[in-house]
A protein has these predicted regions:
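Short, Lys/Arg-enriched N-terminal segments with co-localized hydrophobic residues
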Residues: 7-19
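N-terminal lobe of the biotin/lipoate ligase/transferase fold
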Residues: 16-186, 242
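Solvent-exposed residues in well-ordered beta-strands and their adjoining turns
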Residues: 139-141, 197, 210-212, 237
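C-terminal accessory segment of soluble enzyme catalytic cores
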Residues: 179, 215-267
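Histidine/acidic-rich helix-loop-helix segments that form or flank divalent-metal centers
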Residues: 191-194
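Conserved phosphate/anionic-ligand binding catalytic regions in large, soluble enzymes, centered on
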Residues: 202-210
Length: 267
């Protein structure tokens, strides 16, 4: 038990150092990838981080004096930021209403649009090419264990990115995501949808930021279950095509700023 107690103290001290110091987040751009493949990959990373934490949790619950190395503990949970574009797909959150899907299966298949019920929060949304989909896999125990604050930070990343393009993004009370003119009745338009899942404070899923997205796909759903409000894109707001690489760089820079992290890249 003495070994277990020392490991728990070490785990708490290192977590404190992580909070005080700038943490590193491994960035991976997955390119164009099927939704299910990206979902499975997120689950793989999440479960690996949970496995690394599970030894410490078992010690805290008095499971014995198991000896572990710091290479197999919570001390080495790895943060990730994944960027991806998906072929056309509708995804429905676990609290979503299937009635917000306005297209039948036959027509959806004919148009080549996939459909998945997911384990994230939120309702129905669309993912497609020329949309920056970001999946942060973060251990919130090394940040703040507050889902609300985490969602607000994701929103802030996109709000700052819009500001880089001279666009005022904002929040809409009670509606997670990023909007333009949320207070102007009849002109409210959503530019970024957000839906996440956490397990043992490890996050997955994330945000979908419309850059040059084909907005016609949103005509066949009630986006996020919110009727009578529009969806927009960076292209539509600026009146021109936007360079995707440029937009990604801006999102990455603002992610580092808001979360106080440093993105690192694999060679």
């Amino acid at each position: 038990m003495w070994i277990g107690a020392k490991l728990i103290v070490a785990h708490l001290l290192v977590n404190l150092l992580f909070i005080m110091d700038k943490q590193q987040v491994l960035f991976r751009d997955l390119g164009l990838m099927e939704y299910k493949a990206a979902w499975d990959y997120q689950e793989l990373l999440l479960q690996e981080n949970i496995r690394r934490k599970s030894v410490v949790y078992s010690l805290e619950s008095g499971a014995g004096n198991t000896v572990i190395s710091t290479h197999d503990s919570i001390l080495t949970t790895q943060h990730y930021l994944l960027f991806v574009e998906h072929p056309p797909v509708y995804t429905l959150g676990k609290s979503g209403n299937i009635e917000n899907v306005l297209i039948n299966e036959e027509m959806r298949t004919r148009k080549g649009i996939e459909f998945f019920r997911t384990n994230r929060g939120g309702d129905i949304t669309f993912h497609g090419p020329q949309q920056i989909v970001g999946y942060p896999i973060l251990d919130l125990e090394k940040f703040e264990t507050d889902i609300g604050k985490y969602l607000r930070k994701i929103e802030e990343v996109i709000i700052l990115t819009l500001a880089d393009y001279g666009i005022k993004g904002d929040r809409s009370p009670g509606e997670t995501g990023v909007w333009i003119d949320p207070d102007v009745k009849g002109k409210e338009r959503k530019i970024c949808a957000i839906g996440v899942r956490t397990s043992r404070w490890i996050t997955m899923h994330g945000f979908a930021f419309n850059v040059n997205t084909d907005l016609s796909y949103f005509n066949f759903i009630i986006p996020c279950g919110i009727s009578n409000k529009q969806v927009t894109s960076l292209e539509k707001e600026l009146g021109r095509k936007v360079d995707m690489d440029e937009a990604k760089e801006k999102v990455k820079r603002n992610f580092e700023k808001v979360f106080g992290v440093e993105l690192k890249y694999e060679v």
